[in-house]
């Protein structure tokens, strides 16, 4: 009986992690890919126009802390001239944003 309970707990935890990962990918595809690309390279028409960073580049990833990425997603991002280039993700929870940051980290090569 104990083995069945442990198995059920592990299975539930694994399912929750899988759901979180797929939610992050879905959020990326819906909210981020238009500029940053499905592959994170930022080479979409909009991404090139706005100067989106290449998240597959290890040096770009190293220069961006999780905290800075979280803040940019939560509050939006302005360029050096003060022009909004990324709107805040108002409909995402903090957990959703953390998931997006973690998903963005998977692009690093």
Regions found by a protein language model. Give the residues of each.
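The canonical Cys-X-X-Cys-His
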Residues: 28-38, 100, 104
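Sequence context surrounding c-type heme c attachment/ligation sites in exported
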Residues: 21-33, 64, 94
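Axial heme c-ligation environment in periplasmic c-type cytochrome domains
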Residues: 46-54, 58-59, 72-107
């Amino acid at each position: 009986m104990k083995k069945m309970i442990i198995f059920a707990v592990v299975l539930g935890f694994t399912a929750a992690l899988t759901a979180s990962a797929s939610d992050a990918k879905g959020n990326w595809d819906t909210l981020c890919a238009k500029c940053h690309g499905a592959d994170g390279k930022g080479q979409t028409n909009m991404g090139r126009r706005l100067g989106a960073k290449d998240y597959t580049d290890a040096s770009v990833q190293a220069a961006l802390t999780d905290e800075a990425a979280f803040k940019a997603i939560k509050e939006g991002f302005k360029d050096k001239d003060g022009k909004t280039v990324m709107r805040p993700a108002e409909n995402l929870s903090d957990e959703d944003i953390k998931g997006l940051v973690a998903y963005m980290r998977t692009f690093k090569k």
